Amino acid sequence: MKPKKKVVLKFDKRFVNDDYELLFNSSTGLELLQGVNGKDDPFSLCLPSLLDIGVMGTCKNRCQFCYQGHEQRPNMKLSDFMSIIDVVHQHTNQVALGGHGDPNKHPQFAEMVEYCRKHNVTPNYTTSGIELADDEIEISKMCGAVAVSDYEKNFTYDALKRFMDAGIKTNIHQIFDAKTFHKCTSLINGIDYWSGRVDIDRLNAVIFLLFKPQGSGKKMRFLIPTETQLEIMSDRILSPKCKFKVGMDSCLANHVLKYQTPSKLQAMSIDTCEAARMSGYITPDMKFKPCSFAECSTEVNLNGNLSEIWNESEPFKFFRDVLQQKSNTCPIGF
């Protein structure tokens, strides 16, 4: 009888306090969280392990469904971005560069990515791929992963190819709504909806994002998936037949877990809402709130101690209270 192989997990970043240990592998993105000193795994952290930073305030794409709306604001200042990283870098493992527009079009995009890596924080971002420049691809090699939003346009497929040609871990972000229901379920069933325009063998994953009737999307509530569509999607996404990996945002996961029970292995990688527990969002004008979809009334000005806002402000405590009562729910009703 052959002896069992011992599996050794390698991590290059560690945070530990009296309550928990947080381990991270910056190459694979694997994160391990566990209670210490006889304590259970924590419900929430002392700071976010994933921080969504809205570096962009401007966007010329004007997508009809944009949850950010079409109001144009100044982009985040590099000095503000650096001050955030200075505060959180010991605890925060990943930052998602986002906001109202393509992060790679920020004038200091390269400096932001480099500053993250200098402080052992892994940057990731999503882009439309429009007017993607060679130097943006080069700096993207320092990111953990890049996602391209699927607009089904030539610039979408061109961006995907160029990222993959550069050896960058590349994902597709696909909105799941009433209109894209057939496309999403087809992709999961292994049907090449892109008709060869995407190199499926090199694609890392397709991440399905639940449509949010927020911002400009408030006028498009007809895109909200029906209960039947959600139930079918929930069954398909846990039994994929495609070559690439499949993922979903926590907003969609909340609904999936209402209809399906994941396997033990799936349960380890499916997260319900993490807002105010494991993640938070900072706007281009330095307002800290539990998630990027939260209304303005839940914003907290980032003019004090970030840790104090995270742990003591009413918006963050409200989110945690709701999620503690029911994990697979949305505190703002999505």
Over which residues does each language-model region extend?
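Flexible mid-to-C-terminal extensions adjoining Fe-S/redox cofactors in radical SAM and related proteins
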Residues: 1-19, 27-30, 285-334
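A C-terminal junction/extension of Radical SAM enzymes
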Residues: 1-9, 13-15, 205-290, 333
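Conserved alpha-helical substructure of the radical SAM core
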Residues: 6-17, 25, 30-136
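Hydrophobic beta-strand positions
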Residues: 23-24, 281
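Short cysteine clusters
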Residues: 59, 63-66, 273, 291, ...
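Short, solvent-exposed loop/turn segments at secondary-structure junctions
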Residues: 60, 131, 153, 177-179, ...
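Radical SAM/AdoMet-radical enzyme domain recognition
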Residues: 78-210
